[in-house]
Swiss-Prot record:
InterPro entries: G-protein_beta_WD-40_rep, WD40/YVTN_repeat-like_dom_sf, WD40_repeat_dom_sf, WD40_rpt, WD_repeat_multifunction. GO terms for biological process: mRNA splicing, via spliceosome. The lineage of its organism: Eukaryota, Metazoa, Chordata, Craniata, Vertebrata. It comes from the Eukaryota. GO terms for cellular component: cytosol; proteasome complex; U4/U6 x U5 tri-snRNP complex. It comes from Bos taurus (Bovine). WD repeats lie at residues 90-129, 132-171, 174-215, 278-316, 360-392. This is Proteasomal ATPase-associated factor 1. SUPFAM superfamilies: WD40 repeat-like. The keyword Lipoprotein does not apply.
Amino acid sequence: MAAPLRIQSDWAQALRKDEGEAWLSCHPPGKPTLYGSLTCQGIGLDGIPEVTASEGFIVNEINKKSIHVSCPKENVSSKFLAPYTTFSRIHTKSITCLDISSGGGLGVSSSADGSMKIWQASNGELRRVLEGHVFDVNCCRFFPSGLVVLSGGMDAQLKIWSAEDASCVVTFKGHKGGILDTAIVDRGKNVVSGSRDGTARLWDCGRSACLGVIADCGSSINGVAVGAADNSINLGSPEQMPSEREVGTESKMLLLAREDKKLQCLGLQSRQPLFLFIGSDAFNCCTFLSGFLLLAGTQDGNIYQLDVRNPRTPVQVIHRSGAPVMSLLSFRDGFIASQGDGSCFIVQQDLDYVIELTGADCDPVYKVATWEKQIYTCCRDGLVRRYQLSDL
């Protein structure tokens, strides 16, 4: 992770023709950047280009959609993946959020063009348009069933939609500012929202009622995450008897990524604080990796890994560039992160190289969603990209 490798965003097209070239660079912190290039020496019988690297770089392996390159001087290597397919017809403008259903069949996305749409994950074909929010939709996600969608908008409303007929079945009102992120508790009888009004609220989907303000922190809540706590963590007990409408909140932690540089963690049912961590800049996003490990990303490009049992000192801080960390997602034995400079990368515990998802050219990648070995990203350039991971 020490010295990120970067590559020309359209390297796969560039290296498909004879003598085609693509640039390459290595960025060791505090040292001069190393620049290099890849050159296509011809196309093999299998349709795979034969590629050589300039001095200081080595091509370890190449396929039609991936190239594994290392920089021995800095002892780093990255496997760059080109998109398997790109969907350009879902939206006309920047795509702010996306999710894939639990069965992998459907995608949902929201855009700066004001729309929220459900589409077929295999080919990007439009299925439904979800209309009803005033102003932009900030976040959208499927419930675990894959048949229902939860969305939050700048109109301070949370809505629940049927993916089958696009009807809005529930609207939650109570926030006084735009909703920036949501999380689903357990199987989805309850949901959590974080807002620009500085509050995180717990909602009862069945009665479309607010079950309580879980946190009121006076600062915009940019990201929320709910996770099951490890048995060793004392979540505290609630001061009042929880409503019988609260379902699945016990033994859960709530994580809040705040604009005031604070990362807040509390017991979801107990409402009791677990820790408050101060970072280098505004926190944009957060996720749980396990019952005690979590990740949170900041506006100045830091990814903090913290242990809830000892949150004062980060387990590690990953910094690859100063670009804002836009999204974080737990994936297999590691995570996927996306940043405001178009980089999107996968870190796995047992891999000694980073997997880079390429294609975005300096445009922020706002959100990542996965289904099995497929990874979907959405970007300011208005494209949804689908990547196919070979065996990790």
